[in-house]
Amino acid sequence: MSRFFVAGYNSDSSSEEEDLLSSDEELLSSSSEGEQETSDDDSLDFDDQSDSDSSDSDSDGRPSGPAYFLKKDFMKGGAGGDSDSDSEDEGRRVVKSAKDKLLDDMNESIEAINVARRSDTWTTVVSEFDKLGRLLVRAGQQSVSTPNAYIRCLADLEDYITATSENEKTEKSLNAAEARAFNMAKQRVRKQIKEYQAQYDLYRENPELFEREESVDIAAPSRSDVPVEDTTGRVLSPVFTILKQIAETRGKKNIDKYEQIKTLEDLLNDNLAKGSVFELISIYQMLLSIRFDASANQNFMPIEQWKNNEADLTSLIGLLESNKDTYQLSELGSTTDDIDIEPVANESGVKAIFGSITSLIDRLDDEFTRSLQNTDPHSIEYVQRLKDETTIYQLIVRGQSYIESITPAEVQQSVEQLSRVVLRRLEHIYYKPDQLIKANEAEAWKGISHESVIVSKDSTPAELIEGLSSFLTKHKNPVYAKHALLFSVYYYAVNNNYNRAKELFLDSQIFNKIHHADSSLQVQYNRAIVQLGLSAFRNGAVEESHKVLNEIVNSQRSKELLGQGFNSKYPNQATTVEKAKLLPFHQHINLELLECVYSTCSLLIEIPALAAATNSKDSRRKATTKSFKSKLEFHDRQFFTGPPESIKDHIVHASIALSKGDWAKAYQLLSSIKIWKLFPDNDDLLAMMKNQLQVEGLRTYIFSYKSIFSKLSLGKLSQIFELEADKVESIVQKMIETNEIGGTLDESKAFIQFASTEPQRSRLQELAIVMNEKVGLLTEKNEKTSSNGYGKKQPQQQQQQQQQQQQQQQQQKDLLQEDNSRFRYANVNTNNDEFQTTA
């Protein structure tokens, strides 16, 4: 609607409004010139006052035009003089700055705390104290010094808490909620006192200083090159001034660690020539620690920072070696009250500084492992990064040599720092063949002048492993001995010393205690038994290899059990802690090779067993591997089968050929598998497999055709299977002695004559007999059910025979279970680091 149609509007009122607008604008401009130096809070307060004044004028019924709602607040109403006079009559409002408001809020909280503690309302004390802490954080953000009232509040609270604690009657009168709040208040007050220790101590010494409003500032150390005096009155050198400043900021938020690293690097370069040994050691320790802290929240330490730390750690060890007669860095050293105080020299004149070369080496090695874990193992970057292992191993050997030289001989067996670095050295060599260990040792001992007491530099790889393991075995902590044992078993198994590895493993009885171990030990145990099984296969112990590898290959968590990945979850679902437990790729055991070895062992064991199962009794006695048998049955059900492509296809086709006695074709199929080249002794392995196929092919041939032939010529068998006549004779003789076949050798030992009293049945007849037995058992159960669970009473003699048979079967079962439990894998629980032994 047009304003000309609004009731009460005329031209006179319009002119009056224009006059009012012009007069108010003049008033506004004049007032703004006079108030240029006022704060923002004052201007806000002025707006509030003009709002209230305008609302008063509106309530007086002053005329308003159609555009009244479009006008500013100060334009509404009558002349400005009336509103000014009204506000002057009401009194000018006091305006406070943000700092003053913050201090008022803190004083209110302090007063609330004082009132609440007098009434023993500790829940209120805790809530107000937390509020006071938040206000104190805001004060720090606004560059407001710590108020004196806060220090007084801390002191008063501590005195009152101490008095309440001493008064048992008062403390016992508190209810459960107040008692919990009282304990919380006690802890938080102590924590705050430690944070403001300097102001607190000054208040206890001179309380009058804290009675005034101005905050008491504690002077901070200066960064200048002039020595400064700390709060205790000691004069600090410029080096320790900077070190102390950095040490006080460690662990706090919003600290630029890379700036601290740059500061320490400059400090180190400036003092390398002129600084004292104690100052240089302190700088090195601080610099290495800050670099590690800077990468704590990253997946791994940047390579440049890692190399800098490696170089500085090498320089630190060199500095310690050159000043070994005056300064030592050891975990056995004594701590001092402050960073700039040197420890007292011992009777030999050596000052033992508290620190740990072993911890620095461990952290550097852990960062190297994390870097490998987060690098693509199939890339060139992984290979380039792996070259740094020689550097870290040389550092480990040098660190071990230094720690040996400063550790007294009588305490070497009980000192953790020496055992840890020896274990770290063993971790880097146990999985390698002898040739690589020799190369690593030759490179590591370059530049090391003094000998090692534990193992000399000229030791062979076997002597090196034996010496390091024997040292760890003597340590009072049994964890070191277990790790050393498993590392030794793995080493001997990798280097094809199966008998020594098996002897160590069985004599230790570690399989009885492994379910109480931690995750790293469990994973190492599984790796050791897997490598033991592979070594058994390389040495021709097929049955032992099958027994060792059976459970871990058939499990669905082989990657987790060996510390090589996760079978039960996607990689992105694994936590950081779980990923840290995984081994680098170059330490992995090839799972395809593991499965190939196990399948080959199953072939050599199960094919003769299937051929020997001529009746139901034999079928029950020789239980076949279901997984292997199912593979053969699945292949038989296929209508069209092409040539073998995968490892599994080669194994199945070789099994079919061996079941027909065609050992040559079986060998040709198995030897064509390329994965055998991963073994260093590939030619010896293929020769062993050929011999095993000849022997098992002979046994399978005899089992298959004993029901057809009445006698077989040993010479003909020797010709077919390309075995010596004496060996064929010994195999046949053993089969007769173990009742695997019924027969005898003639006088000339040229023929085997089969003479079996057992009926020769076809496969259909065997199935019919099995079905008849099952029907009989079902009938007996039905008779018991019909007679309320009681069957016909058997004769006492028959009952005794059955009991004896059951006892014998139970004894055999217990012996078999005990034998199998020796090579039972450890079930690693990656969620909560619990370990169990599978049933």
Swiss-Prot record:
**Annotated region (Disordered), positions in chain:** 1-93, 783-839
Question: Which residues fall in a compositionally biased region of kind Low complexity?
Answer: 794-812
Q: What compartments host this protein?
A: Cytoplasm
Q: Spell out the GO cellular component terms annotated for this protein, sorted alphabetically and separated by semicolons.
A: cytoplasmic stress granule; eukaryotic 43S preinitiation complex; eukaryotic 48S preinitiation complex; eukaryotic translation initiation factor 3 complex, eIF3e; eukaryotic translation initiation factor 3 complex, eIF3m; multi-eIF complex; proteasome regulatory particle, lid subcomplex
UniProt superkingdom = Eukaryota
> Which residues lie in Acidic residues bias regions?
14-27, 34-58
The molecular function terms of the Gene Ontology recorded here are: RNA binding; translation initiation factor activity; translation initiation factor binding
Q: For this UniProt record, give its keywords in alphabetical order, as a comma-separated list.
A: Cytoplasm, Initiation factor, Protein biosynthesis
Q: What is its main location?
A: cytoplasm
- An example of a Pfam family matching this protein is eIF-3c_N
Q: Which GO terms describe its biological process?
A: formation of cytoplasmic translation initiation complex
Q: Does the keyword Protein biosynthesis apply?
A: yes
Q: Which family does it belong to?
A: Belongs to the eIF-3 subunit C family.
Q: Which HAMAP family match?
A: eIF3c
| Quaternary structure annotation from Swiss-Prot or TrEMBL | Component of the eukaryotic translation initiation factor 3 (eIF-3) complex.
Q: What is this protein called?
A: Eukaryotic translation initiation factor 3 subunit C
Q: What is the lineage of its organism?
A: Eukaryota, Fungi, Dikarya, Ascomycota, Saccharomycotina
